[in-house]
Amino acid sequence: MADQDQLKALRLRIDSLDEKLLELISERARCAQDVARVKTQTLGEGEAPVFYRPEREAWVLKHIMQLNKGPLDNEEVARLFREIMSSCLALEQPLKVAYLGPEGTFTQAAALKHFGNAVISTPMAAIDEVFREVAAGAVNFGVVPVENSTEGAVNHTLDSFLEHDMVICGEVELRIHHHLLVGETTKTDNITRIYSHAQSLAQCRKWLDSHYPSVERVAVSSNADAAKRVKSEWNSAAIAGDMAASLYDLSKLHEKIEDRPDNSTRFLIIGNQEVPPTGDDKTSIIVSMRNKPGALHELLVPFHNNGIDLTRIETRPSRSGKWTYVFFIDFVGHHKEPLIKDVLEKIGQEAVALKVLGSYPKAVL
């Protein structure tokens, strides 16, 4: 009886806390509406209000994580506040975000992780279409994959940066877990075909060699497409993630079958607005150099001499001429910082061409 009384008292306390939480969240939402009104009223002629500020969101999430004393871990607390901010921002202006579709892809999961579930997300059939939607102003932002820890760079994304003038506004890192999914009618002891995206098949190669060595592996346009195909076939399975399993009502025959447990993909947020410095930023650039001995060394010397950390470097052949190569470089810092400005100026003196793709806050989640 005493235990029941204690449970009742604790539940009453939770109910009271929930009421207070609701009151505070509602107050925050009303404050967001006030922010929208102030921004709109202070605009100059011909100016459009900027409601989503990546640097502000990054600061809020980091601040909350610094204040957190548990028992929820920092990432869980940050996710809760991300959703609160997403819902409040939707009251100011619902964000439209394009991503590499269809529904159920890891790119959609990355978009929702970064922007929260209150955004209007639109699937695109190809990476280049995401760039075009953003360039045309049909959406506010786009989300595209740029590199995987197992398979390396996503060349379609790198090539799209050569063709479009886009600004990188943020990054998202997503831990990738692959599952072998089956439908209600699948005869699991007679699977003869496994569908997935080519990169996912590659990321699960060893597991497939061990468990399904003689089964046909079919590369399709996306993991979500693989999941859709399984719904109508009794002898096939798909490799995809949690979102696709839930969306297409599939069961997990085997979970987490990726060869590397640290398998992750990095995604970029592209838009049309520059992001101010936060003090904890990355910058991405494209540099075109002549194909001559020592070209890469010349490019890297200014970074080394000024103690600037490079986080990624990729090489692609230039489309403008067979004697030119293009380097995609990510490094720590913001292009508005004096030291970074000096380094970029030195690089520009040696390069055929230099383009700053954007400076943006490091991934918080």
UniProtKB/Swiss-Prot annotation:
The record places the site described as Essential for prephenate dehydratase activity at T265
SUPFAM superfamilies on file? ACT-like (SSF55021), Chorismate mutase II (SSF48600), Periplasmic binding protein-like II (SSF53850)
Which cysteines does the record link by disulfide bonds?
Answer: none
Give the reaction(s) catalysed.
chorismate = prephenate; prephenate + H(+) = 3-phenylpyruvate + CO2 + H2O
Q: What is its EC number?
A: 5.4.99.5, 4.2.1.51
Which keywords does this Swiss-Prot/TrEMBL entry list? Amino-acid biosynthesis, Aromatic amino acid biosynthesis, Cytoplasm, Isomerase, Lyase, Multifunctional enzyme, Phenylalanine biosynthesis
Signal in keyword set: no
Q: Which residue intervals define the domain ACT in the entry?
A: 284-361
**Could you tell me which InterPro entries the record lists for this protein?**
ACT-like_dom_sf, ACT_dom, Chor_mutase/pphenate_deHydtase, Chorismate_II_sf, CM_dom_sf, CM_II_prokaryot, G/b/e-P-prot_chorismate_mutase, Preph_deHydtase
Pathway noted in the entry = Amino-acid biosynthesis; L-phenylalanine biosynthesis; phenylpyruvate from prephenate: step 1/1; Metabolic intermediate biosynthesis; prephenate biosynthesis; prephenate from chorismate: step 1/1
Q: Which GO terms describe its biological process?
A: chorismate metabolic process; L-phenylalanine biosynthetic process
Q: What is this protein called?
A: Bifunctional chorismate mutase/prephenate dehydratase
Please tell me the species this chain comes from.
Answer: Pseudomonas aeruginosa (strain ATCC 15692 / DSM 22644 / CIP 104116 / JCM 14847 / LMG 12228 / 1C / PRS 101 / PAO1)
